[in-house]
Amino acid sequence: MTSSKDVYRQALIRVLQAAYSGELAAGFAYAGHWRSVADPAERERIRTIEAEEWLHRQQVGDILIRLEAGPSRAREFAFSVIGRTLGPLCAISGWLAPMYGAGFLESRNIVEYEVAAELATMSGHVEIVECLLEMAEVEWEHERYFRERVQSHRLARFLPIWKTPPPKSEIRRNRRGLAA
């Protein structure tokens, strides 16, 4: 008979496998994105975001090992192709599309790490909650940066902007006791 903790552990592994492969795509895409922008400050900020995505991938990989799991080979292949395709496309798609796409995806990453933190608690792996919440907070900063960049564009008023995430402080406030 499977315990509820085992069910939550398997769900946690699936979320982390998705995050791990998503960070692969993000790393490759941001490598092309920062090279495509002309503004030095934007270039440097996106380079920093790229480095943070690679760090998240390493951290998620370490967590998967701790959970005696590994990445999904199918996801790894698919997301590698996606990231390696999107990166070079940034150079020809203009400034707005990569900023918009990045912001939208970062908004989803926040939730992904919040869900992972909840599943970690429910599966009895409270030792990884802090790391997951920290990654959610970093993703929140990424989303804010790209939202601000998109909103600075003259066409922004014509675009349906993705839902604004709750304030960054809510990431921890909503999860009080998860790491306890």
What are these regions (language model features)?
Residues 1-180:
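Non-heme di-metal
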